[in-house]
Amino acid sequence: MFEIKVSQEIKDACPVFAGAAVYAAVKNTAYCEGLWKEINAFTEELTTTTQIEDIKHQPVIAATREAYKRCGKDPGRYRPSAEALRRRLMRGIPLYQIDTLVDLINLVSLRTGHSIGGFDADKIQGAYLELGIGKAGEPFEGIGKGVLNIEGLPVYRDASGGIGTPTSDNERTKMNLGTTHILAIVNGYNGKKGLKEAAEMILSLIHISEPTRPY
């Protein structure tokens, strides 16, 4: 288990911020048919009921974008992951099929608008994480993105440095088929509303996709 702290700089910039964490023992799989039926159903619903210009106004996404501005980042250049995923689907580009754990985190993010950090808990260094604001020149290798400029982005740090932002998580702590413990953090830059439901959705999808032992 981990202690998760919120720095004073985040409290000052984002006073209503709240978060929820899920820690579970898991057995990852390459693909889950039932999960992808849900992803495809959501994709159809989104693309038939939403306009691409409306995505940034979804309340949770809008709050995350506002947090970026308060922390010093342009959300038009560095989009929160939930916004980027929805925009991808609206452009007719399917989600990447990665593995079951990554795919279910993406689904919950899509459904709720929350940017969610999904980490291999055994790769996290130390016993606690702290949410702060990225500094100039701070090293961070985004998953599939290469070196990411995290200056002005909210960032979770472990004992070795940054592991997750609302735009991208770090290659160092990413999940893969060998992951046996997951830490998922739901970020509520609009406050507590919807956090419990998002965390429960993550646990439910984990149970559906593969028997697990939640803590």
Where do the PLM segments sit?
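Mobile "lid/hinge" segments at catalytic clefts and subdomain interfaces of large enzymes
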Residues: 19, 166-199
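Glycine/proline-rich, flexible active-site/cofactor-binding loop segments
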Residues: 31-84, 90
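Conserved phosphate/anionic-ligand binding catalytic regions in large, soluble enzymes, centered on
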Residues: 94-119
